[in-house]
Design a protein with these regions (language model features):
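Helix-breaking motifs and short loop linkers at transmembrane-helix boundaries and internal kinks
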Residues: 60, 92, 113-119, 130, ...
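Conserved MFS/SLC helix-loop-helix module at the cytosolic interface between two early adjacent transmembrane helices
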Residues: 79-118
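Juxtamembrane intracellular "pre-TM" segments in multi-pass secondary transporters
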Residues: 16-24, 205-237
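Paired small-residue
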Residues: 103, 107-110, 118-126, 320-328
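Cytoplasmic helix-loop-helix junction between adjacent transmembrane helices
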Residues: 123-164
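Structural signature of the two symmetry-related core transmembrane helices
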Residues: 96-109, 298-312, 391
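Helix-loop-helix hairpin linking two adjacent transmembrane segments in secondary transporters
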Residues: 119, 148, 157-204
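C-terminal transmembrane helical hairpin of 12-TM major facilitator-type secondary transporters
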Residues: 297-340
Length: 410
């Protein structure tokens, strides 16, 4: 018996050695590579958000039309997430990520020279679809290749690359647009992205634990329908849709409001306002800790209420109130989103990766629909219209959270 236990331990140790462990050179290379991939993806994805007021003037389009430069990109990303995850099961993780990240980075350079807004939108649609090949596969790669005890650190580093990239892209574009032009900003970011692509392809270790599987559409469809029949999961998907819709709406049209009288803020300052995203890094972690103590539905409810309070604080004219409101709004959003996404994985009883993909699909679909629809309210009613629309989405979210609280035992 002792011999068998010893052999079992030796076998387990050998298996752990096969996986990438924290503290090894391979771990550092893999994590820096995926950090770079996450940074590139979200820096380029949201690159047009601070530029919406510029697009309305340069291309002579409405704010709603300008917002499509982001909404259509996240829409194609949403559909791409459902496709690339399945394709990678057959074609491999690193291959698809490498192809997608190079194509998407090159497209940023092409977008910079778009002679018309229609062409810009077409390129952004293709770019969003290409970038879907990163988030849908990166976590699967980490789960397969990283040793279990090191996985939490690896996931955290990858997600930090996402958030820092999204923040850096917005700040960089706002600053370079003021100093030179938005075209120069895109050329700079596109060039940085291509350099990072080369590093990613060199540094990311090849998959050792990936097992190719033939595409089987029927089991995927059965699993999909099973998730969509679960009332708790459907409610969580809808919460993702409405929360992200409200979040993108506020940040899409905040720039328009702050370039108008009595504020007249520059693109640089508007770009730096996105630094409030940093409070989301804290709230997402803190809410996760509190969720274990007080329950996940209650924390999602708390985050949504904070978003409502934040939106209401943006209504007074003094910019101080608007900035405090945006901080509270952002704090609540990231807290609620982190707990809701975790509850999806916790509640799903099978095919957890697919359930998470459906959550992300709803999340980015909300970004597309909410961001574009919010433009109609901005054009018709100004900032009060944007806040009214956002409050409506958040009230629906509150009702859905109460439904989850009633149905879920979490």
């Amino acid at each position: 018996v002792n011999l068998m236990i010893t052999m079992s331990k030796d076998k387990q140790a050998a298996m752990n050695k096969e996986h990438i462990q924290q503290g090894t050179p391979a771990f550092k290379k893999a994590n820096f590579a995926l950090f770079a991939a996450g940074f590139i993806t979200f820096a380029n994805l949201y690159i047009t958000q601070p530029l919406l007021p510029i697009f309305t003037k340069e291309f002579h389009v409405t704010p709603t039309m300008a917002s499509l430069s982001l909404s259509l990109t996240t829409l194609s990303l949403a559909f791409g997430l459902l496709i690339f995850g399945s394709l990678s099961e057959a074609w491999g993780r690193k291959n698809i990520m490498s192809i997608c990240i190079v194509i998407a980075s090159l497209l940023t350079l092409v977008v910079a020279f778009s002679p018309s807004f229609k062409l810009l939108l077409m390129l952004r649609i293709i770019q969003g679809f290409a970038f879907a090949g990163i988030p849908s596969i990166a976590m699967a790669y980490l789960g397969e290749e990283i040793e279990g005890r090191s996985l939490g650190v690896a996931m955290g580093l990858y997600i930090s690359g996402n958030s820092i990239g999204g923040l850096a892209g917005r700040v960089l574009m706002g600053t370079i647009t003021d100093l030179v032009s938005w075209t120069a900003g895109m050329i700079l970011l596109g060039s940085i992205s291509l350099i990072a692509c080369v590093y990613f392809m060199w540094a990311l270790p090849p998959s050792k634990h990936f097992v190719s599987q033939p595409l089987a559409l029927r089991p995927l469809f059965r699993s999909l329908m099973s998730h969509l029949k679960d009332p708790v999961l459907v409610s969580l998907f809808l919460i993702a849709f409405f929360l992200m819709g409200s979040f993108v709406t506020v940040f899409n049209y905040l720039g328009f409001k702050l370039t108008e009288p009595p504020y007249y803020l520059s693109m640089t300052i508007i770009g730096w306002i996105f630094l409030v995203y940093l409070v989301g890094t804290f709230s997402s972690t803190w809410f996760g800790i509190l969720a274990d103590r007080y329950g996940r539905p209650l924390l999602i409810l708390t985050g949504t209420v904070l978003m409502l309070c934040g939106v209401l604080l943006t209504l007074p004219i003094p910019i101080f109130y608007k900035l405090i409101g945006i901080v509270i709004f952002t704090f609540g959003f990231f807290g609620a989103h982190s707990v809701a996404s975790g509850l999806v994985s916790r509640h799903a009883t099978h095919d957890i990766a697919q359930a998470s993909s459906l959550y992300l699909f709803a999340y980015y679909l909300g970004s597309s629909v909410g961001g574009a629809t919010g433009g109609v309210f901005w054009s018709l009613f100004g900032w009060s219209g944007v806040t009214s629309f956002t409050i409506g989405l958040l009230i629906i979210s509150l009702l859905l959270v109460l439904r989850v609280k009633k149905l879920s035992k979490a």
